[in-house]
Amino acid sequence: MIDKLDKKECCGCNVCGDACPKGAITFFEDNEGFLYPSINKEFCIKCNICEKVCPVINIDALKRNDFEHPHCFAAIHRNLQVRFDSTSGGAFSAFAKKAYSEKAYVGGAIWNKDWSVSEYISNNKDDIEKLRSSKYIQSNAIGFYASVKKILQDGEKVLLCGTPCQIAALKSYLKKDYENLITLDFICMYVNSPKVWHKYIEFLEEKYSSKVIYLSLIHI
């Protein structure tokens, strides 16, 4: 079962919850606001599917690609406003625009009304505004992998941008390659504490006697 994984090794991808056939895995917030899995032993049938999809436990099997050598490119969006609204050059916006033009679904992290972060996917080109730019906070992906799999099985094209652990988790969850799926990940050191983040938002709102209405993390 997934509880064999030491807490400090858990990457917080949430994929074990989507994979559990009995809904025995839920997630709780620790004292820093990070989400961790919890197993209801009454529902668990010890099938170990949660272990089989875990990107940390199966990291060696997931370290594969089709390139003899890595191919490296540098890119920046031509539109200055897009670069300003993005975090690191606007490349995602270019990929997303192309995907939307082909009627594809685009997924990634978005801000919620309370400035928490969750995973989101749609084929609405207007959603690019909330999908672009980095968030730097742990994202709630509960239910997301199942949604992506359903869209892929329906034959729809999907472009998905996420952290390396999220992309590895998705590929492990899908169990096979899909020709209609393109994934984008990025170099990621860690995600910040959601609880500290919310404390920071509260600090700003108290300091300026106003609600936060817009966020840009380019200089944070």
Please give the residue ranges for each predicted region.
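Small-residue-rich anion-binding loops in enzyme active sites
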Residues: 1-8, 109-113
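Conserved SAM-binding loop
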Residues: 12, 46, 159-160
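Iron-sulfur cluster-binding cysteine motifs and their immediate structural context
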Residues: 2-3, 9, 15-32, 36-38, ...
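Iron-sulfur-associated redox domains of electron-transfer enzymes in respiratory
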Residues: 58-218
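Short, charged amphipathic alpha-helical surface segments
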Residues: 42-43
